[in-house]
Amino acid sequence: MKIDYKKIAEELIPIFEEAGQKSIDLYNKGLKIEIKEDGSPVSNGDLKVDEIISKKIMQLTPDIPIISEETVNIKEKNKNTVFWLIDPIDGTKEYISGKDEYTLNAALVVDKKPIIGLVGVPKKKQLFYSYAIGQSFIRQNGDDKKIDCKKKNNRNNIIAVSSMSKPPELIMKKLNEYNVSSISKVASSYKFCLIADGTFDIYAAKERANEWDYAAGHAVAQNAGAIIKTLDEKPFLYGKEDYKNPSLLIKRSENLYD
């Protein structure tokens, strides 16, 4: 199967912008919220964004299956080698509460690795996208800029990003191996993007969430030069039958100061 990754990613950019604006419009009108079987909230914003993104992806790649958080049957095992992962709104709680760090996510996985990744951050008017090694970008206010996470850094200024202000002991132990000086709390897959652009240096997490939560941000960060593995230094791969993520370690570079 011949896939033009660049063309597909670029054709999805206006769709992500449309879906992002729709998420804002629906929030402003007042969201309709339900509770899913797993106890997590879902809004009409999640569902509408899913519809907009999925429709365009089906047009672009009709033969490639889509696995979306909002439509997947978790009991069905994933046996695909090429597939899309969509998390229409990662950070639904942030979205519902009016915060600005929720994200729109889509990734194309090929042979266990995310190649294309798009992460929209509507309230910040940012869109991160990538389609190949060395080809990660941020679009802001209509302008596209290539991003690269490599930079010179003071050894005493290693900054971690986390979904918690106080990560658990296992994670702190790993962060201390890299002489982390401070931890900033950020929600959703936006964390991946802020490593991709060099804002933060490292992110570590225990086993959590599902593949659609990570894949798009993974592509953006890895294609910007980040090193992404499990906590025990194994490759971080996709296409697991149950969609569950292992532990995660993202580093801006091998030693974080050059």
For every predicted segment, state its role.
Residues 117, 136-140, 162, 202:
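Short hydrophobic/aromatic-rich beta-strand segments that constitute the beta-sheet cores
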Residues 66-70, 143, 232-234:
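Short gly/ser/thr-rich secondary-structure transition/capping motifs
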Residues 149-258:
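An extended, acidic
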Residues 23, 46, 57, 92, ...:
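Residue-level signal for inorganic ion chemistry
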Residues 1-89, 173-177:
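N-terminal subdomain of lithium-sensitive/metallo-dependent phosphomonoesterases centered on the IMPase/IPPase/PAP
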Residues 78-137:
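DPxDG-like acidic metal-binding loop motif
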Residues 71-77, 94, 194, 232:
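Conserved PLP phosphate-binding loop immediately N-terminal to the Schiff-base lysine helix
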